Curated annotation (Swiss-Prot):
GO biological process, one term: ribosomal small subunit assembly
Entry similarity comment: Belongs to the RimP family.
Subcellular location(s) per record: Cytoplasm
Chief localisation class: cytoplasm
Protein function: Required for maturation of 30S ribosomal subunits.
Full protein name: Ribosome maturation factor RimP
Claim: Cytoplasm is one of the keywords in the record: yes
Native organism: Alkalilimnicola ehrlichii (strain ATCC BAA-1101 / DSM 17681 / MLHE-1)
Top-rank lineage group of the source organism: Bacteria
GO cellular component: cytosol
Keyword set includes Hydrolase: no
Cystine residue pairs: none
Keywords: Cytoplasm, Ribosome biogenesis
Length: 152
């Protein structure tokens, strides 16, 4: 996690927790002038548009005061949705049994993309059972992006 994201987590996580929400993850990036700060939130009852608006106002107020991001950016508050991105190591166990798509930052065993059934977090990495039935353990530090997927 980049320093900016660490700072954002430190500012936003306690705020959302106090409001009864879970900070699922943070994405920040884009070209200069079009930077986007996307914050994923969740709650046991799910997320409504009103929840997103409430959290947006509270988070925006904190970010205006603390000013952790230089320059202009757009703040977007979102639920993780059904094709939920995975940000936390604990989520690999939490969503075991679900379909997952993983993209790596560098090739591992000759590949950068994996897809299959999430089997949890093992000693050597994220366990995924691929379509042909083989289980792979992907090193956690190589995972650039992971997302649950819906399969018909």
């Amino acid at each position: 996690m980049a320093a900016t994201e660490d700072t954002l987590y430190a500012l936003i996580d306690p705020l959302l927790t106090g409001m009864g929400y879970e900070l699922v993850g943070i994405e920040y990036g884009g070209p200069a002038g079009k930077r986007l700060l996307r914050i994923y939130i969740d709650s046991p009852d799910g997320i409504t548009l009103d929840d997103c608006e409430t959290c947006s106002r509270q988070i925006s107020a904190v970010l205006d005061v603390e000013d952790p991001i230089p320059g202009e950016y757009t703040l977007e508050i979102s639920s993780p949705g059904l094709d939920r991105p995975i940000f936390k190591a604990s989520d690999y166990d939490r969503f075991a049994g679900e379909q997952i798509k993983i993209r790596l930052s560098a090739p591992w065993e000759g590949r950068r993309r994996f897809k299959g059934v999430l089997a949890g977090l093992g000693d050597e990495g994220v366990r995924v059972v691929e379509a042909q039935g083989d289980e792979v353990q992907i090193p956690l530090d190589l995972i650039e992006k992971a997302r649950l997927i819906l399969e018909p």
